[in-house]
Curated annotation (Swiss-Prot):
<dbReference type="GO" id="GO:0050566">
    <property type="term" value="F:asparaginyl-tRNA synthase (glutamine-hydrolyzing) activity"/>
</dbReference>
<dbReference type="GO" id="GO:0006450">
    <property type="term" value="P:regulation of translational fidelity"/>
</dbReference>
<dbReference type="GO" id="GO:0050567">
    <property type="term" value="F:glutaminyl-tRNA synthase (glutamine-hydrolyzing) activity"/>
</dbReference>
<keyword id="KW-0067">ATP-binding</keyword>
<comment type="similarity">
    <text>Belongs to the GatC family.</text>
</comment>
<dbReference type="GO" id="GO:0005524">
    <property type="term" value="F:ATP binding"/>
</dbReference>
<dbReference type="InterPro" id="IPR003837">
    <property type="entry name" value="GatC"/>
</dbReference>
<dbReference type="Pfam" id="PF02686">
    <property type="entry name" value="GatC"/>
</dbReference>
<comment type="subunit">
    <text>Heterotrimer of A, B and C subunits.</text>
</comment>
<dbReference type="GO" id="GO:0070681">
    <property type="term" value="P:glutaminyl-tRNAGln biosynthesis via transamidation"/>
</dbReference>
<dbReference type="GO" id="GO:0006412">
    <property type="term" value="P:translation"/>
</dbReference>
<keyword id="KW-0547">Nucleotide-binding</keyword>
<dbReference type="InterPro" id="IPR036113">
    <property type="entry name" value="Asp/Glu-ADT_sf_sub_c"/>
</dbReference>
<protein>
    <recommendedName>
        <fullName>Aspartyl/glutamyl-tRNA(Asn/Gln) amidotransferase subunit C</fullName>
        <ecNumber>6.3.5.-</ecNumber>
    </recommendedName>
</protein>
<keyword id="KW-0648">Protein biosynthesis</keyword>
<comment type="function">
    <text>Allows the formation of correctly charged Asn-tRNA(Asn) or Gln-tRNA(Gln) through the transamidation of misacylated Asp-tRNA(Asn) or Glu-tRNA(Gln) in organisms which lack either or both of asparaginyl-tRNA or glutaminyl-tRNA synthetases. The reaction takes place in the presence of glutamine and ATP through an activated phospho-Asp-tRNA(Asn) or phospho-Glu-tRNA(Gln).</text>
</comment>
<keyword id="KW-0436">Ligase</keyword>
Length: 100
């Protein structure tokens, strides 16, 4: 059984806020989830092969094709405002400073 104090601790760690009257509800819900997990942990899976996918389909991938075209101008067309031309000249994105 997950206690009200444990629910409050989990909520604090997850930075969740909810009404005090919901603590009892979350306590019973989390306890039932933990009970289901305990049941699953009791199942013997030693001879079961791991499942990697529920469907046996391969992803269709296009072949890689090497091209000599320079796509940088198309890429830098996405830059907004006056810094677009400068970005095309120096070949990198100019962003606001985010670290002191």
């Amino acid at each position: 059984m997950i206690t009200k104090e444990e629910v409050k601790k989990i909520a604090k760690l997850a930075r969740l806020k909810f009404e005090e009257d919901k603590v009892e509800e979350f306590s019973s819900r989390l306890s039932s989830i933990m009970d289901m997990i305990d049941i699953l942990n009791e199942i013997d899976c030693t001879d079961v092969k791991p499942l990697t996918s529920v469907c046996d389909m391969q992803a269709r991938m296009r072949p890689d094709e090497v091209t000599s075209k320079d796509h940088s101008n198309e890429l830098f067309d996405n830059v907004q405002g006056a810094s677009q031309q400068l970005a095309k000249e120096v070949k990198y994105f100019i962003t606001p400073k985010v670290v002191e």
